[in-house]
Structure formats: structure tokens, C-alpha cells
Amino acid sequence: MEDINIHKLKTGIVDLMSVHNRSEWIYRVRQSYQARDQIKKKKRMIFINIETVYSSKREQITKAVARRLRGKQMTCPPKFMGDIRVILGPGVARKLYYSLTKYSTSHHVQQVLSTQAVVLERYWLHHAAFTISKFYNETDLPPRGHHMYRWPRDLLAPDVLFFVNATKNVGLATGFDQPYTAFTERLIQVFRRVDGVKVVELSPSKNYLVVVKNIISYIREQFRDHPDINLPGLDLPGGVLQKDITKR
């Protein structure tokens, strides 16, 4: 758990890569990735991360936002790395694989941002939230400010992370069929405590387009005049956000 916010090309990851060094995805990552704190500041497109408590409708939201921004929809792990997961059993190898996927995704995003906005479904916080929530219970969850919630220094952070929350009245409010449990509550608390990235919390809705509307409204209001970010024309009417849970 001490390494959850330190994503590096550790010896174990390099060893994992060498075992599969003939695989196309390993070659691409090993030859092209160089860890950087962030993209050098210059005029570019926006990088957005979409996270949800429940997976239902997350892909629809991501796809719709990418379409509105005339950008690229992406997911983590990248599709070209998906096949390797099925041959890795539980244990260290799989943990190293998931760390490696974050770097591959980061590199791919950096390549695209010069020409297109990127809307990414799942990223570091998705994995971290589930890991922390499984490891701790309600009484010993690390407090806000703990290093586990800190975005990794060497992993590209999104310009804004939209977190679609859950509600205890899941079926009535959102149409989701997953139960609201103590684990769900821990997930929400982890999402709210993350540090080092702008997190905006959104209310769920049966109609996912309501969530999309709120996302586009926030982007237009907060990034239209940003000195470092280009945005395509946005003409969708504004929406009402639940709350902005970070003040950074």
C-alpha cells in the first residue's frame, strides 16, 4: 500500500516487460515512454478524466463528452494492452501490469493532446480507489491529506477529473441496479480525498445526457479563456453542478 501513489518503471516492471519483449505492446511502451511530470506548458487541447462509482453509463458519458469536444475517447488500460491481462494470474505480475498501463495511457494522451481533446474513461484514481477501499474499512480509512491520496508525481494528471457520484436511492435516482453498500461509501470518500488533481463531483441521473450537459457547462465556464488550452466551439446550454469538491 505504500507504493500506491508511486508509479515508476521499477525493476519488477522492467523484468515483466523483458519476459514479453517480443509482444508488440511491450515494444511500443518500452521504446517510446519517458516519464515526465507533466506536458510542457504550451497551447494544447484539454485532457479530461471521467470516473464513476458504478460502471454503468460511464462509457456513454465518456463517448458523448468526447463527441461534443470533437476529441478522442480513450480508456485505461489501452485496448492494445488488454489481451495480456488474461494470461496474468493474481499477484505481483498483475499489479505491475496495472502500473504499466497507467504509463502507457499517459504517453498516448500526450501524443494526442497537440491535435485533439482527450476524454479518458478510468485512470489512476479508479484503481487507487478500489485498492484502498478493499484494504481498509470505514473506521481506519486514511484521513484526508494522507500520501495515499496524492496523485503520482510522474504520471500525467488530467486538467479536470469529473467524478459521477452515487446515491443511496440508486434504483430510483439513476436506474443503476448495483446496491449502495459500505464499500460504495468508502469509494466515495476516497474520490473526495484525492489530492493533486482538480476533482469535480457530479450528481448521477437516469438520463446520462444530463451529466454530459453539466460537464460541458463546466468546461465552457472554466476553460474557455484558459491561456494554455484550446477548446472547440461549445454551444450546449449550461447545467447545474452538484459541487466542486476541490479548491485548487
Can you say where each PLM-predicted feature lies in the sequence?
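A glycine- and Lys/Arg-enriched "phosphate-lid" helix/loop adjacent to the NTP-binding pocket
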Residues: 127-190
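Anionic group-transfer/hydrolysis microenvironments
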Residues: 51-53, 123-124, 129, 165-167, ...
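Hydrophobic/aromatic beta-strand patches that form the interior of the parallel beta-sheet core
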Residues: 48, 74, 119, 160-163, ...
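NTP-dependent small-molecule kinase module
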Residues: 1-42, 61-64, 169-248
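Glycine-rich phosphate-binding P-loop
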Residues: 49-65
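Amphipathic alpha-helical segments
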Residues: 64-72, 162
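ATP-dependent small-molecule kinase phosphotransfer cores
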Residues: 70-142
